[in-house]
Structures are given as structure tokens and as C-alpha cells.
């Protein structure tokens, strides 16, 4: 088992102690918030490092006892059993520390733009898109996050042809980023009289909320059109040109927003979505190149990839990237067991990162 970077851990512990000392002095409100937030992020790693070093010292004591020729057989047997337990605990702590030291995605703490679109399957696909949105909405509530619908186009029988929402909460992108891709549902629709199982699909895109400083958008690269907002039948629903369509000419990305009566609000919402999509398009390109080199199953950035199947007759959910099946479909759709899938995907991604660094997961 390769060693941990002890010098790096010493620096980490010293920095943690320095932050704690700063809190004992006089600090402003904003600085207090920054320090306490950094401490809360460092605390799990610091505790693991301290526990690892305690176990390492205990192992040294046990080894000394085993090497002592005067140790009797009964004491030796007890020491060997203790050594096995300490060795296993040390291995767990080393893995925990290595994972904690992995490079963090700069966007992990950001809010999320969640986009869900009905795919193949007509009305049933729209209903499924609605089910997915409610699943994420309930999951967000369990995390203490908030969800605000930015734009929605309802299906003729319910659900959504398309819905865009902002998920606000610390670590939202870290939790939801592996949800992007094609989600497939297999079930008997309410309108099906023969009892046949239909297969439908919806596409989910999870984009980090991007700030102006993250993406350089030149005014000359934008084509902005204004128009009167239209209802479902194509009729104009107000007399002012409040609807906005923004085209980013270099990438061809188009965002249209008409949900607000305020052109200013529609424009701001459209620009937020545009920034996220431009950033995401570049990240997809980089992720695809990276995953092709590493043959990663998770985080490939391929939005056309079928990632998960929800089979209602069998009550199961299967994530195809990691071959994980849970017979907890009602709990997953209710947002309660979705975390189990997300945690498994995160673990797989971390294992790939560790393998890339030359460590066994």
C-alpha cells in the first residue's frame, strides 16, 4: 500500500489550526462566514488524518509487542487479532483520505440549471418528464435546497414537453451532475387499453449556474430578437414584445424565454441559461476527450447516452453506467432513494480518479 503524502497532510493540519486561531481573534462578519465554511469543509479530512495517525501509532505499539520475545502466547494471540483490526481500519482511513484529497470540481458547490425534455413516446414521454421533475424537486427538498421553475411547456395530457428550473443549494451540482443523459421508462400508460408496456424517454441536462466571469460572451457574438409571447395555440398572449430569443453565433446555441411579462427579466433568464449552456458545451467536449482516454463509464459528458431505465412492472431502476439495479422504484421516484444511485455513481467516479493517479480503489 503506497504511502500518504505526509508533508501535504502536515500543511493541511497547520492551515486548519491557523483558521481555528483566526476565529478566536477579531474578524468581520463576511470573514467569519468564509472561515467557518472552510473549516466545515476541512473538518472531515482533518478528523480522518488524526484518526489515521492514531491508528498508525497504535500499530507501532502492537508490532513492538509482537517483536518482543518475552511476550507470552496468550498476549501474542490478542495482539495479532488487534493488529488485524487496526490494519483494516488503517486501510479504510487511507482510502477516505485519498478520496478527500482528490481535485475538486470548481463547479461542485454551484447552483444548477436543470433541463428536462420529453423524448420518444409522445404524451407518455411528457408525463415521464413530469415524473422526473417531481423526483428531483422532492430530492432537492430533502437536501434543503430550493427549486424555481424558469420556463415550462406543458404536455397535452400533463407533464412537460420541456421544463427548465434553477436548483439552489450548496453542493447542488456535485450531487446532480451525473444525472445528465437519457432516462427511459417502461410502463403501461393510463391510456393503454390492451395492458401493453410502452417504452418512452426523456433527456435530462444538469448545468452548473455560470457567472459572467466564467464565460466570456462578446456582444458581437449575440443575435437578440424580441417578439410578442405566444400561447399554446400560437396566439399572442400580450401586446408588448416581452419574449426574447438570443442566439450565440459562434456555437449556434439558441435560448428563447417568454415566461415573464417583463422583457428585462426574460432577457436576464435567457442570458443565465445561455452562459450555462456555452460552458457546458465546452465541458462536454473536454469530458468526452478525457473519458475516451480513461474509458470512464461515469461523467463521459455524452447527453445521448441512455443512462437509466425505470421499469414500473418490475419495480426496478437500473443505472446502465455502473450496472446497478435497485428494486426501489417508488422510493427513487419519490426522491427518497435517489441518493443511493447518486452515491454509487460518485463512488465509481472517485474510483476512476484514484485509478488515474495510480491508486487502487
UniProtKB/Swiss-Prot annotation:
GO molecular function, one term: translation release factor activity, codon specific
Keyword line: Cytoplasm, Methylation, Protein biosynthesis
Primary localization: cytoplasm
Pfam families reported in the protein's UniProt record: PCRF, RF-1
InterPro entries xrefs: PCRF, Pep_chain_release_fac_I, Pep_chain_release_fac_I_sf, Prokaryotic/Mito_RF, RF-1
Subcellular location(s) per record: Cytoplasm
Disulfide bridges in this chain: none
Modification note: Methylated by PrmC. Methylation increases the termination efficiency of RF1.
Cellular component GO terms, alphabetical: cytoplasm
Modified residues (N5-methylglutamine): 235
Family: Belongs to the prokaryotic/mitochondrial release factor family.
Physiological role: Peptide chain release factor 1 directs the termination of translation in response to the peptide chain termination codons UAG and UAA.
Protein name as annotated: Peptide chain release factor 1
Amino acid at each position: 500500500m503506497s504511502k500518504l503524502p505526509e508533508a501535504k497532510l502536515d500543511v493541511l493540519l497547520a492551515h486548519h489550526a491557523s483558521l481555528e486561531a483566526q476565529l478566536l481573534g477579531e474578524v468581520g462578519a463576511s470573514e467569519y462566514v468564509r472561515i467557518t465554511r472552510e473549516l466545515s469543509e476541512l473538518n472531515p479530512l482533518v478528523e480522518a488524518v488524526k484518526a489515521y495517525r492514531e491508528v498508525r501509532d497504535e500499530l507501532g505499539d502492537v508490532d513492538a509487542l509482537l517483536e518482543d520475545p518475552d511476550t507470552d502466547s496468550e498476549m501474542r494471540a490478542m495482539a495479532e487479532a488487534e493488529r488485524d483490526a487496526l490494519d483494516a481500519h488503517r486501510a479504510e482511513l487511507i482510502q477516505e483520505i485519498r478520496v478527500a484529497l482528490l481535485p475538486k470540481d470548481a463547479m461542485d458547490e454551484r447552483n444548477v440549471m436543470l433541463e428536462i425534455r420529453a423524448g420518444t413516446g409522445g404524451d407518455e414521454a411528457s408525463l415521464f418528464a413530469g415524473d422526473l421533475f417531481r423526483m428531483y424537486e422532492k430530492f432537492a427538498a430533502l437536501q434543503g435546497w430550493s427549486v424555481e421553475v424558469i420556463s415550462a411547456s406543458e404536455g397535452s395530457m400533463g407533464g412537460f414537453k420541456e421544463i427548465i428550473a434553477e436548483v439552489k443549494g450548496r453542493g447542488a451540482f456535485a450531487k446532480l451532475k451525473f444525472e445528465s443523459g437519457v432516462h427511459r421508462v417502461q410502463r403501461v400508460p393510463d391510456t393503454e387499453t390492451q395492458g401493453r408496456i410502452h417504452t418512452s424517454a426523456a433527456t435530462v441536462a444538469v448545468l452548473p449556474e455560470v457567472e459572467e466571469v466564467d464565460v466570456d460572451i462578446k456582444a458581437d457574438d449575440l443575435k437578440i430578437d424580441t417578439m410578442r409571447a405566444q400561447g399554446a395555440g400560437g396566439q399572442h398572449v400580450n401586446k408588448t414584445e416581452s419574449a426574447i430569443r438570443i442566439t450565440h453565433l459562434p456555437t449556434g446555441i439558441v435560448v428563447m424565454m417568454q415566461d415573464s411579462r417583463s422583457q428585462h427579466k426574460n432577457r436576464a433568464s435567457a442570458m443565465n441559461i445561455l452562459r450555462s449552456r456555452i460552458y457546458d458545451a465546452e465541458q462536454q467536449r473536454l469530458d468526452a476527450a478525457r473519458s475516451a482516454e480513461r474509458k470512464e463509464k461515469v461523467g463521459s459528458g455524452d447527453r445521448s447516452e441512455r443512462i437509466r431505465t425505470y421499469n414500473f412492472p418490475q419495480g426496478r431502476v437500473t443505472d446502465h453506467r455502473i450496472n446497478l439495479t435497485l428494486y426501489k422504484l417508488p422510493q427513487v421516484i419519490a426522491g427518497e432513494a435517489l441518493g443511493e444511485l447518486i452515491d454509487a455513481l460518485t463512488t465509481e467516479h472517485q474510483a476512476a480518479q484514484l485509478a488515474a493517479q495510480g491508486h487502487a480503489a
